[in-house]
UniProtKB/Swiss-Prot annotation:
Record-level GO BP terms: calcium-mediated signaling; cardiac muscle hypertrophy; cellular response to amine stimulus; cellular response to serotonin; cGMP-mediated signaling; chemical synaptic transmission; embryonic morphogenesis; ERK1 and ERK2 cascade
Site positions per UniProt: Hydrophobic barrier that decreases the speed of ligand binding and dissociation: L208
Name this protein carries in UniProt: 5-hydroxytryptamine receptor 2B
CC terms in the record's Gene Ontology section: cytoplasm; dendrite; G protein-coupled serotonin receptor complex; neuronal cell body; plasma membrane; synapse
UniProt remark on domains: Ligands are bound in a hydrophobic pocket formed by the transmembrane helices.
Alphabetized Gene3D superfamilies for the sequence: Rhodopsin 7-helix transmembrane proteins
Native source organism of the sequence: Rattus norvegicus
Length: 479
């Protein structure tokens, strides 16, 4: 029995060892499966991260690069092209600066947050600075569009007062005011700062939270978007109404006699006859060989007729400019409306799904960034001067084209609006007495029949050439 007990005990011990061995093998097998499963998860995560980086690269080429390149071209065009250096176009250049800064400092960092799955990858102190620049440059872009619409409406409604204030200095003052308003709207972000968790400082999301910036998200959206949007819509329709009213008056006005275009008594003296080829005294004092045809009456009336079309051409150019503005505002509305509506909803709606709204904000903010790259495209499509300048700059040709303006120089000094004293000073400076060069003086009896006619042609050519130049300028500045 003892022997039997020992064998039974031995058998029991052997079975116990065998059971433990089997359990160990099973655990080892399960551990191997877990390790294999963990490896698969790590591989899947790596693939997902690779897809995120690839998508980020597509965003760089699709949004950021065109935004930077297009706005640089706009800044170069206004800076180098004399035909584009007008007060209104300085607004466009400042708008391009704001959009360029969005492409340089805001979009790349926003792209980094996408690559790192919304975790702030830079030093913590840079987070409020980046948020401030984001709000500042985006607000400045919106405010510039609002200022341009206001400026256009005032120029059409009160052209005389607007022309008196339409200087480079005045434009720079207006631009400064726009930037100061934008800074005032964005300044609460760095003052308030972000609420950082010191324990998890490496896992911070750089965004405006509802708890800390709820009131700013609401009132900032009203000041930076909805108020300018209201102003733009109202001024745009008022501008269209004013242009239609002007066009109606131009089409239905009675034909005007040209009695106000009588030649000044300063020039109603004898002048040399141009019916034969000889040197003609130009208004800038130079000499030029020129033959005037005998049918000077027909030429004069044709030039007067073309000058009479100036108001209609101006109305047409202004209507075209308003259409371009309408396209700009339409794109602006489509690009920024989703973001600001979602932003206000996030600030007001407590029962809404906050995670879903934050995800929509991350998508819609990039739609808003696209607006910074759309503006240069619109200028390229609708403005021939911008289009020609962009084409030359892309081929590294930065030399501005020279506009042909033969009598433009003297027209800025001598024209009907000047006083008689100013015109007399001009003649004295260029050695012309009573509108005549002494070296070219001939007998009054010989030239009596063509005196007033020839002098009228000289000054009317100057006046009409100036009008033609204004016509070109109107076509250059569409905004």
């Amino acid at each position: 029995m003892a022997s039997s007990y020992k064998m039974s005990e031995q058998s029991t011990i052997s079975e116990h060892i065998l059971q433990k061995t089997c359990d160990h093998l099973i655990l080892t097998d399960r551990s191997g499966l877990k390790a294999e499963s963990a490896a698969e998860e790590m591989k899947q995560t790596a693939e997902n991260q690779g897809n995120t980086v690839h998508w980020a690269a597509l965003l760089i080429f699709a949004v950021i690069i065109p935004t930077i390149g297009g706005n640089i071209l706009v800044i170069l065009a206004v800076s180098l092209e004399k035909r584009l250096q007008y007060a209104t176009n300085y607004f466009l250049m400042s708008l391009a600066v704001a959009d360029l800064l969005v492409g340089l400092f805001v979009m790349p960092i926003a792209l980094l947050t996408i690559m790192f799955e919304a975790t702030w990858p830079l030093p913590l102190a840079l987070c409020p600075a980046w948020l401030f620049l984001d709000v500042l440059f985006s607000t400045a872009s919106i405010m510039h569009l609002c200022a341009i619409s206001l400026d256009r409406y005032i120029a059409i409604k009160k052209p005389i007062q607007a022309n008196q204030c339409n200087s480079r200095t005045t434009a720079f003052v207006k631009i400064t005011v726009v930037w100061l308003i934008s800074i005032g709207i964005a300044i609460p972000v760095p003052i308030k700062g972000i609420e950082a968790d010191v324990v998890n400082a490496h896992n911070i999301t750089c965004e405006l939270t509802k708890d800390r910036f709820g009131s700013f998200m609401l009132f900032g959206s009203l000041a930076a978007f909805f108020a300018p949007l209201t102003i733009m819509i109202v001024t745009y329709f008022l501008t269209i109404h004013a242009l239609r009213k002007k066009a109606y008056l131009v089409r239905n006005r009675p034909p005007q006699r040209l009695t106000r275009w009588t030649v000044s008594t300063v020039l109603q003296r004898e002048d040399s006859s141009f019916s034969s080829p000889e040197k003609m005294v130009m208004l800038d004092g130079s000499h030029k060989d020129k033959i005037l045809p005998n049918s000077t009456d027909e030429t004069l009336m044709r030039r007067m007729s073309s000058a009479g079309k100036k108001p209609a051409q101006t109305i047409s150019n202004e209507q075209r400019a308003s259409k371009v503005l309408g396209i700009v505002f339409l794109f602006f509305l489509l690009m920024w409306c989703p973001f600001f509506i979602t932003n206000v909803t996030l600030a007001l709606c407590d029962s809404c799904n906050q995670t879903t709204l934050k995800t929509l904000l991350q998508i819609f903010v990039w739609v808003g960034y696209v607006s910074s790259g759309v503006n240069p495209l619109i200028y390229t499509l609708f403005n021939k001067t911008f289009r020609e300048a962009f084409g030359r700059y892309i081929t590294c040709n930065y030399q501005a084209t020279k506009s042909v303006k033969v009598l433009r120089k003297c027209s800025s000094t001598l024209y009907f609006g000047n006083s008689m004293v100013e015109n007399s000073k001009f003649f004295t400076k260029h050695g012309i007495r009573n509108g005549i060069n002494p070296a070219m003086y001939q007998s009054p009896v010989r030239l009596r029949s063509s005196t007033i006619q020839s002098s009228s042609i000289i000054l009317l050519n100057t006046f009409l050439t100036e009008n033609d130049g204004d016509k070109v300028e109107d076509q250059v500045s569409y905004i």
